[in-house]
C-alpha cells in the first residue's frame, strides 16, 4: 500500500456496494496560519457519497465545513491541546473552540486529535500523545 497526498482533492474507496470519499485539503487556518485550502475543488465529484475530510486546522470546521458543505466527518489536529491539560482543562479552549476529541453538530462531526509531538517546548503535561482508531459502521 502506498501513500497518496490529497492536496485539495479526493479519492474514493469502494467496498461492496458502499463508497467513502477521503477528501484532503491543504492548510486552511486562521491568521497567522496560511489558508491554501480549496474545499469546493476537493469536494467536486463527491455528491451522494459519505465524506471524510482531512483538514489540519480544526477552525476550518466552523469557518467553512459546517456552513458550506455536507462533509459528515472531519479529522483534524493542530492544537496539540497546547501540550497542557489538567483535570480536563487546557488553555487551548481559549484559542480553539474545538481542541480535543469529538464534536457534533447536526449530522456532521469533527474529531480533533492532540497528536504525538510538541511545538517549541519538548514536553507535555496531561495532554498525552495519542493515536486514534476510528471505526466507521453502516447505520
Stretch-by-stretch model annotation:
Residues 1-139:
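Soluble catalytic domains of enzymes that build or remodel membrane lipids, polysaccharides, and related
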Amino acid at each position: 500500500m502506498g501513500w497518496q497526498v490529497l492536496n485539495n482533492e479526493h479519492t474514493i474507496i469502494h467496498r461492496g456496494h458502499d463508497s467513502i470519499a477521503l477528501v484532503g485539503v491543504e492548510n486552511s487556518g486562521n491568521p497567522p496560519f496560511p489558508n491554501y485550502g480549496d474545499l469546493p475543488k476537493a469536494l467536486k465529484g463527491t455528491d451522494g457519497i459519505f465524506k471524510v475530510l482531512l483538514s489540519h486546522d480544526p477552525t476550518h470546521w466552523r469557518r467553512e465545513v459546517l456552513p458550506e458543505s455536507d462533509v459528515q466527518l472531519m479529522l483534524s489536529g493542530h492544537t496539540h491541546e497546547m501540550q497542557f491539560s489538567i483535570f480536563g482543562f487546557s488553555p487551548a479552549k481559549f484559542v480553539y473552540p474545538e481542541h480535543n476529541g469529538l464534536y457534533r453538530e447536526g449530522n456532521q462531526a469533527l474529531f480533533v486529535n492532540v497528536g504525538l509531538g510538541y511545538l517549541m517546548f519538548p514536553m507535555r503535561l496531561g495532554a498525552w500523545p495519542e493515536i486514534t482508531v476510528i471505526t466507521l459502521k453502516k447505520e
